[in-house]
UniProtKB/Swiss-Prot annotation:
Extracellular topology ranges: 1-23, 78-91, 158-186, 411-424
Gene name tied to this protein: tyra-2
Protein family: Belongs to the G-protein coupled receptor 1 family.
Name of the protein this chain belongs to: Tyramine receptor tyra-2
Membrane-spanning segments: 24-43, 55-77, 92-114, 135-157, 187-209, 388-410, 425-444
Main subcellular localisation: membrane
Entry GO CC: plasma membrane
Organism: Caenorhabditis elegans
Length: 468
């Protein structure tokens, strides 16, 4: 008679949880390996991308890839099984490799930020030294400092520890592979692996943000100066002929209608964001009578002025041309002219004041239209810069701060040990930073995006036969 085993609801829930946990860990490990390997492939196939900043990002990808290949597979099996199922000697190697790769990854983040900080704050002095040799020194310093922290227990520090890395629980039936239970080493490793590089990272990115903000402020100021002087002056000078044409109508009512029409056109142009810094183009044709001696009247002469005014617009199709052709009789010196000179000067003065007020209004509207676009571009760039810095620091802090807080707290508070599931979640939250780094440090790099697109979309070219 065969006995059948029926799973209880508790067993089914536990099995489902294990399956989901194993699937999530498997996908995380797979993505960490794939994404960081992709960074290497792109850098290898594109020599143009092998610059100092990209080499530092490549070293970051190498440390994350090493974590994904060596540490994460063992850690995932350990998390699913709930105990250390590998040989005892492998426990020390696992812990040392974990500290080495995690520390190198964190320090690489700081070095990438430090390189950007030097390039922005000391461009002349640093750019002369920013070469592959400098990048090699920085990369070597990262791995040396990480090795001094991770290999310290193997070099004799663990001899003073009360318990080794591998401990036995539940009547010596369950083995657990843990970090070295030694307060001095805990402080040493946490300080060197997290707190110092974190402070350095926040400092350099804060300075980068300050330098970025000052640069944008100076750029806006220079744009304002350009708008206030050269561009505005050229625009006003180029439209003098067009503005003077408003003096010619003798009817005040007609001049008022023309003025209101121009105001409405200028307002509509600014509201639609069409103002731009293009210079107005003036074409002036002064036409003289060919047969002046024959056609000139004894009492009057005719002078014709034709002006073509192209207003400053942002789109070609918005070019505004106005042909103004006025014939003004100029009386010769006579008694009638002398009597009418004073009223004419009065009319001209009134018309000139109207034109002057209208020109001042147009100048203010034009100035605002030119200033609006640089401010919008500056604000967009500043928001993007702040967004990138926020993502870098935010992801790093969210991923690693809980782990190192728990790491130090548990060492000095034995009763503060979290639940096994919470401890596993916090540990893997730190590991997940290695899966995010390839996205954060490459998605905002346009050159990398282009190279990555070419890597997946480029077709194989037919091989050309070489002549022997």
């Amino acid at each position: 008679m065969m006995s059948s085993y029926v799973m209880s609801p508790v067993d089914e829930t536990y099995t489902l949880f294990q399956i989901l946990k194993g699937s999530a860990l498997f996908l995380l490990v797979l993505w960490t390996i794939f994404a960081n390997s992709l960074v290497f492939i792109v850098l290898y196939k594109n020599p143009r991308l092998q610059t100092v900043p990209n080499l530092l990002v490549g070293n970051l990808a190498f440390s994350d890839l090493a974590l994904g290949l060596i540490v994460l597979p063992l850690s995932s099996v350990y998390a699913i099984a709930g105990e250390w199922v590998f040989p005892d000697a492998l426990c020390e190697v696992f812990v040392s490799a974990d500290i080495l790769c995690s520390t190198a990854s964190i320090w690489n983040l700081s070095i990438v930020g430090l390189d950007r900080y030097w390039a922005i704050t000391s461009p002349v002095a640093y750019m002369s030294k920013r070469n592959k040799r400098t990048a090699g020194i920085m990369i070597l310093s990262v791995w040396i400092s990480s090795a001094l922290i991770s290999l310290a227990p193997l070099l004799g520090w663990k001899q003073t520890a009360q318990t080794p890395n591998l401990i036995y629980e539940k009547n010596n039936t369950v083995r657990q592979c843990t970090f070295l239970d030694l307060p001095s080493y805990t402080v040493y490793s946490a300080t060197g692996s997290f707190f110092i590089p974190t402070l350095l990272m926040f400092f350099v990115y804060f300075k980068i943000y300050q330098a970025f903000a000052k640069h944008r402020a100076r750029q806006i100021y220079r744009q304002k100066l350009a708008v206030s002087s050269h561009v505005i002056r050229k625009h006003i000078e180029s439209t003098i002929l067009h503005e003077i044409s408003h003096v010619l109508p003798t009817s005040d009512e007609f001049a008022k209608e023309e003025e209101e029409e121009e105001d409405s056109e200028s307002s509509g142009q600014v509201e639609n964001g069409l103002g731009n810094g293009n210079d107005a183009i003036i074409e002036e044709d002064e036409c003289e009578d060919e047969d002046s001696d024959e056609k000139r009247d004894d009492h009057t002469s005719m002078t014709t002025v034709t002006a073509t005014v192209t207003g400053p617009t942002e789109a070609p199709y918005m070019k505004r041309e106005a042909k103004i052709s006025k014939s003004v009789p100029i009386e010769k010196e006579s008694a009638i002219q002398k009597r009418e000179a004073k009223p004419m000067r009065s009319v001209m003065a009134i018309s000139y004041e109207k034109v002057k007020r209208h020109k001042n209004r147009k100048e203010r509207i034009y100035r605002k239209s030119l200033q609006r676009k640089p401010k919008a571009i500056s604000a967009a760039k500043e928001r993007r810069g702040v967004k990138v810095l926020g993502i870098i620091l935010g992801c790093f802090t969210v991923c690693w701060a809980p782990f190192f807080t728990m790491y130090v707290l548990v060492q000095f508070c034995k009763d503060c040990s979290p639940n096994a599931h919470i401890e596993m979640f916090i540990t893997w939250l730190g590991y997940s930073n290695s899966a995010m780094n390839p996205i954060i440090y490459t998605v905002f790099n346009r050159d990398y995006q282009i190279a990555l697109k070419r890597l997946f979309t480029s077709e194989k070219k037919p091989s050309s036969t070489s002549r022997v």
